[in-house]
Design a protein with these regions (language model features):
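Class I S-adenosyl-L-methionine-dependent methyltransferase module
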Residues: 41-48, 52-200, 252-380
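Bacterial N-terminal signal peptides that target proteins for export
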Residues: 10-26
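Conserved Class I S-adenosyl-L-methionine
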Residues: 326, 441-469
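A short glycine-rich, Lys/Arg-flanked "PGG" loop and its adjoining helix->strand segment in the class I
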Residues: 414-426
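Conserved beta-strand signature within the Rossmann-like core of class I S-adenosyl-L-methionine
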Residues: 426-435
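A short acidic, Gly/Pro-enriched loop at the edge of an enzyme's catalytic core
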Residues: 241, 385-399
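Class I SAM-dependent methyltransferase Rossmann-like catalytic core
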Residues: 181-243, 261-265
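A short SAM/SAH-binding and catalytic strip from SAM-dependent methyltransferases
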Residues: 396-411
Length: 470
């Protein structure tokens, strides 16, 4: 993993940054030592911050919801932060399992169809899955591993896994991962059989509350967000020029996602740029003053974004690869979004070659202009336990949290919503594609639920919820 020095966080820790600069000598030595201006303070949620949320959840029985004193809350919220951050390693283990299932950069073996196809519940892995485990182990021990394989190698080293034990560890991890995927699917089936739509939504909205925190990302989610914002504009919920500062919570890092599992291009982040371009395309923002802040607790994500922003200050563009699988059968709107992504904030670039094993995959590449890449600032913040303390009128006008709050229970989601509300300007918009807690701070007004399909056959898509800060 990239080296990481996490800033000290006290009751109101300050992360300092020079205006428009992420770089000093320590940054060059360790790219994830993030330096911000005194304007940006990361604070734990106080008892006063969450008093409204605690009242709503007093009888829920969820951990932390029955706390009635400030001192007890201060202890609990810090313990909660440590517990949430401890889930990052399990998320990395999940990403490594996806790399075993679908990766093409280290082997020409056929990809597996899904985690469930790796073997039977509680039983050994299939020979096809074991062959891919062995291929990854060989790659990890090779002299010149690629970027993702180096990450796996460094992760195993950090976990204290000896070279001779790597195969056993990765096998057990894949078995665990496959069993969990089956359990998630079973929970959804059982909720569907209940006939209770509230039960279905609750199950979907908290499905991964005990799972490791994944850093996966997807282009199509950003298409759904743009379509949703267009709808809000049509309904007069958003005005031209109303967005200056955007917060992207959990921006993601394209390691090997659970849908397509591509790993033949460098690690990349997309959502910060997608949010920026959408705001510009819809005339919600102006190129000269738009800013994007990413809030994440994953050191690898923060380091990656800090590095790209630093390199942009030196005039280096940021290149993203945009794959499209013809088997996904995108509707025309999705195809148009993919075809024109990056036209406002960059120029078309030469894409990397697609591996022969990935038939039907087309690739576009976009070189994002340094003037836009340099406008992204990463913040090490856990939105469930912390908030960015912002001066008046310096809050966020648009907040995006996709595929992230599903990793938390209803009380944790409500805490996140309380944090988000406190970071927003009045009239600001909050978007999420997770079914969130119906019990949340009154300062967030529910506006709409917008459905967007990613397939002409309607097999999958997103439901985007929108809220407005009163």
């Amino acid at each position: 993993m990239p080296c990481y020095t996490r800033p000290m966080i006290g009751d109101a820790a300050t992360l300092t940054r020079r205006s428009r600069s992420l770089a000093t000598l320590p940054f060059l030595l360790c790219c994830s030592t993030l330096l911000f201006s005194a304007d940006w303070k990361i604070s734990y949620l106080t008892f006063a911050d969450v008093s409204e949320t605690l009242r709503m959840f007093a009888d829920s029985g969820l951990p932390g919801s029955n706390i009635s004193a400030s001192a007890a809350w201060n202890r609990w919220i810090r313990d909660q932060d440590r517990e949430v951050r401890a889930r990052i390693d399990r998320g990395e283990e999940d990403s490594i399992s996806n790399l075993i299932l679908y990766g093409t950069s280290y082997t020409s073996l056929p990809r597996l169809e899904s985690a469930e196809s790796a073997g039977k519940t509680g039983g050994p892995l299939s020979e096809a899955a074991m062959a891919r485990v062995r291929a990854l182990v060989i790659a990890v021990h090779s002299a010149q591993p690629n970027e993702r394989i180096r990450i796996v190698r460094d992760f195993l080293k950090r976990k204290g896994i000896a070279a001779g034990d790597a195969s056993h560890y990765l096998t057990a991890n894949l078995q665990r991962f496959a069993d969990e995927q089956r359990a998630y699917q079973q929970k959804l089936v059982e909720a569907g059989h209940s006939g209770d739509m509230n039960e279905v939504l609750s199950t979907r909205g908290t499905l991964y509350q005990n799972r490791g925190l994944s850093a996966d990302t997807s282009l199509m989610t950003n298409y759904a967000l743009e379509d949703t914002l267009s709808s809000l504009i049509a309904k007069n919920f958003l005005a031209s020029g109303s967005v200056r500062r955007i917060a992207v919570i959990g921006p993601g890092l394209d390691f090997t996602n659970k849908h397509n599992g591509y790993d033949f291009y460098p690690l990349q982040t997309i959502q910060p740029f997608a949010a920026m371009e959408t705001a510009l395309r819809l005339n919600l923002a102006k190129p000269d003053n738009i800013e994007v802040f990413t809030l994440d607790l994953n050191p690898s994500v923060n380091a990656h974004i800090a590095r790209l922003a630093h390199e942009a200050l030196s005039g280096r563009p940021y290149i993203v690869q945009l794959p499209r699988d013809s088997e996904d059968e995108w509707p025309s709107g999705a195809e148009n979004y993919w075809q024109h992504f990056g036209e406002i904030i960059g120029v078309q670039a030469k894409p990397l070659p697609v591996p022969q094993t990935l038939t039907g995959v087309t690739l576009r590449a976009v070189s994002i202009a340094p003037r836009f890449a340099s406008r992204i600032t990463p913040l090490d913040a856990n939105v469930v336990t912390q908030r960015v303390a912002l001066p008046p009128a310096r809050g966020f006008d648009l907040v995006i949290a996709t595929n992230i709050l599903v990793y938390y229970d209803r009380f944790q989601q409500a805490l996140a919503m309380a944090s988000i509300a406190r970071m927003m300007n009045p009239g600001g918009i909050f978007l999420s594609n997770d079914a969130l807690s119906a019990h949340h701070v009154q300062s967030l007004e529910f506006l709409d639920r917008h459905s967007v399909s990613f397939s002409t056959k309607g097999r999958f898509g997103d439901n985007v919820l929108s809220y407005r800060r009163k």
